[in-house]
From Swiss-Prot:
This is Putative sodium channel toxin Ts26. Belongs to the long (4 C-C) scorpion toxin superfamily. Sodium channel inhibitor family. Expressed by the venom gland. Residues 24-92 form the LCN-type CS-alpha/beta domain. It is found in: Secreted. Disulfide bonds join 38-64, 50-69, 54-71, 65-91. Has the structural arrangement of an alpha-helix connected to antiparallel beta-sheets by disulfide bonds (CS-alpha/beta). It comes from Tityus serrulatus.
Amino acid sequence: MVKSAMKIVILILFVLLIRVESKRNGYPDISDGKSSTCRTTVEDSEEDFCVNVCKSIQGRTGNCCLGTCFCFDLPDEQKIVDVMDTTIEYCEWDEEEEEE
């Protein structure tokens, strides 16, 4: 009985200690708590610029949302700028609309 209880405790601890790699969306913290402002270059539109910014920090893609580059599927170690949840929801919704 004690051995099986110990096995259960060890199993629970093991499960809790497993680090799960998750992806998240947001405005990446590029420098000093600020994200990258959308801009065009000779080669890129605003959208292409943001895609390049996001991919350079291991994001899946990005777009220009409310004047700033918003990235999708950023790695956990990438800092993101704190913004209201409604802003994040709007930018995520905007991406879903583009995919349809």
